[in-house]
């Protein structure tokens, strides 16, 4: 079968176009628990991330609900590859292999880890990315599931700065933390426009919002 092939350029990433449709590119989807002032550090536990003297770990706990849990599980139980920074990978590698019954999809998913120093796998299957921005531009062109980024603040910043994020799935909590690692620190990026795809408002004020890159 003869195909008419050409290339189109978007966000410095080439996507293959064929005469009968566009080959689907893998998406990078950032999923974050975020406070009103943009903090994403240590949402789940007191000692999850105490770097830089952060003492407010576990700040999402008071807002837990069955409805929120159900929405989070829709992402946890989908088809994905994990894309993580080194610290998040090390934390999750110590925890999730021992709780495979809770999140079996994470056990079989390929874990892509942005790190120039970590070379020993803690959680198979794992692929280390020593030049993550360059490598991800190529990986997005390959067949496979979308990439899910949880936590991994430094990696998330780099992905936004390089306009590689295709979707955001933000869980916004009605709390101001005042300090800690933020999703968008110091305005160190160019403007990027997203379209609101869906949002869910919980009775306790938590908002789950889904955005897609225009």
Region roles according to the model:
Residues 12, 19-214:
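Enzymes that bind and transform nitrogen-containing heteroaromatic metabolites
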């Amino acid at each position: 079968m003869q195909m008419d092939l050409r290339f189109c350029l978007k966000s410095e990433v080439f996507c293959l176009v064929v005469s009968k449709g566009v080959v689907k590119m893998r998406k990078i989807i950032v999923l974050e628990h975020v406070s009103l002032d943009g903090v994403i550090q240590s949402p789940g536990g007191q000692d999850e991330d105490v770097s830089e003297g952060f003492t407010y770990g576990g700040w999402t706990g008071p807002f837990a609900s069955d409805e929120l849990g159900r929405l989070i599980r829709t992402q946890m139980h989908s088809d994905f590859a994990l894309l993580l920074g080194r610290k998040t990978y090390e934390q999750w590698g110590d925890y999730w292999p021992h709780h495979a019954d809770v999140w079996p999809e994470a056990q079989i998913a390929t874990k892509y880890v942005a790190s120039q120093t970590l070379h020993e796998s803690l959680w198979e299957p794992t692929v280390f990315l020593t030049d993550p921005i360059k490598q991800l531009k190529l990986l997005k062109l390959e067949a496979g599931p979308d990439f899910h980024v949880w936590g991994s603040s430094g990696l998330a910043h780099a992905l936004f700065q390089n306009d590689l994020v295709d979707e955001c799935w933000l869980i916004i909590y009605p709390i101001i933390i005042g300090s800690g690692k933020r999703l968008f620190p110091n305005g160190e990026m160019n403007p990027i426009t997203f379209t609101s795809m869906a949002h869910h408002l919980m009775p306790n004020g938590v908002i789950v919002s889904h955005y897609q890159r225009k």
